[in-house]
């Protein structure tokens, strides 16, 4: 497909079920995650917190950006009044087979309006990719969304919250706050020319913690 019209963030939402079927992957729940996230090695299983509902978190880190994005797409969605208090971050979402129809309709909507959506994205709204259109579609389709993930699973804009720092009163432990107290680390809001390096530094700090246990001998 044309990567100008079908960018990676759109692809993950449009083709997730197609890809699972193509690879013949069985599943109970699906977690769709942006590449800017890292998940802590010993974090509790978030799949146990979903109640088998569409699960995401309420995004309130950049309210002006969100407001402008919502207003920018409002006319496209026929003036639909989106409830900003239910606006979610699409970088980490969990869903299951009962949401297949939702994603299929989202894909159909995109295919039918791809040129207009690309123009809105690049020339008018200039705020993100699929996140705000997905929020509109979630509310238009009246999808039940679980917003109750604990805060440790949604560490975003970590530099603004001073989570890269550590407790200066204990010289023996210089573990950054986000590693010490968080489960799901999102390296968003950073200058793009710094993000990869910061993620690499983080990986070098923790990579030895990710040990894959060998299967039991049969």
Model-derived regions, located:
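Glycosyltransferase catalytic domains, chiefly GT-A lineage
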Residues: 1-218
């Amino acid at each position: 497909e044309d990567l100008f019209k079908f960018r990676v963030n759109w692809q993950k939402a449009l083709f997730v079920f197609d890809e699972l079927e193509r690879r013949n992957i069985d599943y109970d729940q699906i977690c769709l995650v942006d590449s800017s996230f890292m998940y802590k090695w010993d974090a509790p299983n978030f799949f146990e917190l979903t109640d088998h509902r569409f699960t995401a978190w309420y995004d309130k880190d950049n309210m002006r950006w969100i407001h402008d994005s919502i207003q920018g797409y409002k006319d496209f969605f026929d003036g639909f009044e989106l409830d900003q208090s239910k606006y979610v971050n699409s970088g980490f979402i969990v869903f299951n087979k009962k949401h297949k129809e939702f994603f299929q309709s989202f894909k159909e909507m995109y295919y039918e309006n791809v040129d207009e959506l690309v123009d809105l994205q690049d020339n008018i709204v200039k705020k993100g990719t699929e996140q705000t259109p997905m929020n509109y579609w979630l509310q238009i389709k009246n999808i039940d969304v679980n917003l109750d993930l604990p805060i440790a699973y949604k560490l975003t804009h970590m530099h603004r919250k001073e989570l890269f720092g550590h407790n200066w009163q204990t010289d023996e432990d210089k573990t950054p706050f986000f590693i010490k107290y968080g489960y799901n680390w999102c390296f968003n809001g950073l200058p793009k020319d710094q993000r990869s390096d910061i993620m690499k530094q983080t990986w070098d700090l923790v990579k030895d913690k990710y040990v894959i246990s060998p299967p039991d001998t049969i």
